[in-house]
């Protein structure tokens, strides 16, 4: 009787290597994308305080919608990863074409909603010039939203067939383009019109269409895409396929919206305590967000690793890949937490020369160090769960964690409302909100870890 073929042996080293190869180009791309926002703020700050305020307000609306669209479009990552693992390569072109139709629709809806969101500016007591510039910033930059949504469809396609290099190269080129066109249009160099903060919006909107074009060109030209090339023929929308991807993608979008809007709400609530509190909070949050790019990139890679393993009918490897990814994220979190604890004063001084802001920022960075472990765990576990094509449960957990625990607890500690019987004697201001964020992230991490354990065990058992 012939021996049955042995299952491949999984080793931590090979899985870590595979996940790192997938993730590091995406990390470089994420950092370049973040760099565009940093460049917008830094370059506009040299024009005037009013222009900087307008760009900051406009970017806050834009970024919330951008991250939400990113989540809605993420369903293609899971679908293509499963098809790749199952070696169903002939199915992938159809999925990509439908994802592009979905991206066009999602992008147009997001463009409309982004413009409607500017109505908020009329009710928050802005100076007329700041209101007008912030609204114009949003109106212009929203024109890039359809391109961004379609780009994210192609982003999910290329990363899920293990082709992550274009993501890095195109994002870096996009950053360079953004900085150059900012220089032209913000300051009116080389005879171009001096648009101030609106010049950032023009640069970003054009840059998004160019990034979409660059990705299309790369897919058309590179040999790695020949087996799954999606542009062999025209295909009308298949509403059943698009509906299936929306069914997976909308919960991810809601999750991202809940998280980003919670952090945005904290920033607005902290604003009542004055410039020092707001500045220290924003610096600590900015640095924590920068560090978060690493576990976020591991998370996108995890969707691919887990999805491909499930596609090939190997739930044991999927579970192994998931926990190795969680362990990698935790290992990085330990290092980043140690770094923040050791260098929190240096980090604060790098951002500001104001002694009062430095002192409070160094204090808030203690909380940032504390939630590194929870934040890395929740993003890794939720991404792994999405690799199983399960998106509603992470949404429910994260909405509960941020809006059911983090914000209410933060508001009680930060604002000390008189009507609440267990409020602190004095408002803890920004520190109180950070305690709430640590609590919310920890609850999310614990519940998502339990969910991943239960889900992966059921799949291994064949249920």
Question: What is each PLM-predicted segment?
Answer:
Residues 44, 184-198:
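Interfacial helix-loop-helix junctions of multi-pass membrane proteins
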Residues 35-38, 46-49, 83-86, 160-161, ...:
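Helix-loop interface residues and adjacent transmembrane-helix termini in multi-pass membrane transporters
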Residues 52-111, 115, 148-167, 280-343, ...:
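Small-residue-rich hydrophobic transmembrane alpha-helices
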Residues 1-23, 80-146, 192-250, 306-371, ...:
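Short alpha-helical transmembrane segments in multi-pass integral membrane proteins
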Residues 24-78, 141-148, 208, 243-308, ...:
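Transmembrane helix-bundle signature of multi-pass secondary active exporters and lipid flippases
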Residues 73, 77, 141-159, 167-175, ...:
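Short runs within selected transmembrane alpha-helices of multi-pass transporters and secretion channels
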Residues 127, 163-164, 274, 354, ...:
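Short loop-to-helix capping motifs
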Residues 27, 31, 35, 39, ...:
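Generic alpha-helical transmembrane segments of integral inner-membrane proteins
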């Amino acid at each position: 009787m012939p021996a049955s073929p042995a299952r491949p042996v999984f080793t931590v080293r090979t899985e870590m290597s595979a996940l790192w190869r997938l993730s590091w180009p995406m990390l470089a791309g994420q950092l370049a994308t973040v760099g565009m926002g940093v460049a917008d703020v830094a370059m506009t700050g040299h024009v005037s305080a009013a222009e900087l305020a307008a760009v900051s307000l406009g970017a806050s609306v834009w970024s919330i919608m951008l991250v939400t669209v990113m989540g809605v479009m993420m369903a293609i990552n899971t679908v293509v990863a499963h098809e790749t693992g199952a070696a169903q390569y002939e199915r992938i072109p159809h999925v990509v074409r439908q994802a592009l139709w979905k991206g066009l629709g999602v992008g147009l809806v997001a463009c409309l909603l982004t413009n409607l969101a500017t109505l908020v500016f009329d009710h928050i007591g802005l100076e007329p010039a700041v209101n007008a510039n912030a609204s114009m910033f949003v109106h212009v930059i929203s024109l890039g939203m359809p391109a961004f949504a379609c780009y994210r469809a192609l982003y999910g396609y290329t990363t899920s067939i293990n082709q992550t290099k274009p993501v890095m190269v195109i994002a870096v080129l996009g950053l360079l383009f953004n900085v150059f066109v900012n220089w032209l249009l913000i300051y009116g160099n080389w005879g171009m019109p001096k648009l101030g903060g609106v010049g950032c919006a023009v640069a970003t909107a054009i840059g998004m269409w160019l990034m979409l074009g660059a990705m299309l060109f790369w897919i058309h030209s590179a040999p790695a895409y020949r087996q799954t090339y999606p542009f062999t023929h025209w295909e009308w929308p298949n509403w059943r396929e698009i509906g299936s991807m929306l069914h997976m993608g909308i919960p991810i979008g809601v999750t991202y919206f809940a998280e980003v809007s919670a952090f945005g709400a904290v920033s607005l609530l902290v604003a009542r305590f004055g410039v020092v509190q707001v500045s220290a909070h924003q610096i600590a949050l900015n640095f924590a967000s920068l560090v978060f790019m690493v576990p976020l990139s591991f998370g996108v890679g995890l969707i691919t690793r887990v999805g491909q393993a499930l596609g090939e009918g190997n739930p044991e490897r999927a579970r192994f890949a998931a926990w190795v990814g969680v362990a990698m994220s935790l290992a990085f979190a330990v290092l980043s937490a140690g770094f923040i604890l050791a260098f929190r004063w240096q980090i604060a001084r790098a951002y500001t020369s104001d002694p009062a802001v430095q002192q409070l920022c160094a204090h808030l960075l203690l909380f940032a160090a504390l939630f590194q472990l929870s934040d890395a765990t929740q993003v890794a576990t939720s991404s792994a769960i999405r690799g199983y094509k399960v998106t509603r449960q992470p949404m429910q957990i994260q909405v509960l964690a941020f809006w059911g625990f983090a914000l209410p607890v933060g508001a009680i500690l930060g604002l000390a409302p008189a009507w609440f019987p267990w409020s602190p004697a004095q408002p803890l201001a920004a520190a109180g909100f950070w305690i709430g964020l640590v609590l919310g992230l920890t609850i999310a991490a614990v519940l998502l870890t339990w969910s991943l354990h239960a889900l992966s065990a059921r799949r291994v058992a064949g249920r």
